[in-house]
From Swiss-Prot:
It comes from Danio rerio. There is a cross-link at residue 11 (Glycyl lysine isopeptide (Lys-Gly) (interchain with G-Cter in SUMO)). One of its GO terms (molecular function) is protein tag activity. Residues 93-94 form a propeptide. Residues 15-92 form the Ubiquitin-like domain. One of its GO terms (biological process) is definitive hemopoiesis. Ubiquitin-like protein which can be covalently attached to target lysines either as a monomer or as a lysine-linked polymer. Does not seem to be involved in protein degradation and may function as an antagonist of ubiquitin in the degradation process. Plays a role in a number of cellular processes such as nuclear transport, DNA replication and repair, mitosis and signal transduction. Covalent attachment to its substrates requires prior activation by the E1 complex sae1-sae2 and linkage to the E2 enzyme ube2i. The gene is sumo3l. PROSITE patterns: UBIQUITIN_2 (PS50053). This is Small ubiquitin-related modifier 3-like.
């Protein structure tokens, strides 16, 4: 039986990925998500946790915008990678 447990553990580690979401204020929130789960789930959870509207912020990975339909597997994310969050810039008037 003990031989089965490491195999299950390896499968779980390969199926899930730990991601960090870093805000502009220096805060970091960690999430565990499946590699093939759309990142919209993480984005919505982050917004709820931080009290933000998803329309007010943008998520980027390696400088590239993240779409809600993207998955960690599609973006070739690795365990402990960081997603950056930026406040949406609103145009000002003179």
């Amino acid at each position: 039986m003990s031989e089965d447990k490491p195999k299950e553990g390896v499968k779980t580690e390969n199926d899930h990925i730990n991601l960090k979401v870093a805000g502009q204020d220096g805060s970091v929130v960690q999430f565990k998500i499946k590699r093939h789960t759309p990142l919209s789930k993480l984005m919505k959870a982050y917004c709820e946790r931080q009290g933000l509207s998803i329309r007010q912020i943008r998520f980027r990975f390696d400088g590239q915008p993240i779409n809600e339909t993207d998955t960690p597997a599609q973006l070739e994310m690795e365990d402990e990678d960081t997603i950056d969050v930026f406040q949406q810039q609103t145009g000002g008037s003179c």
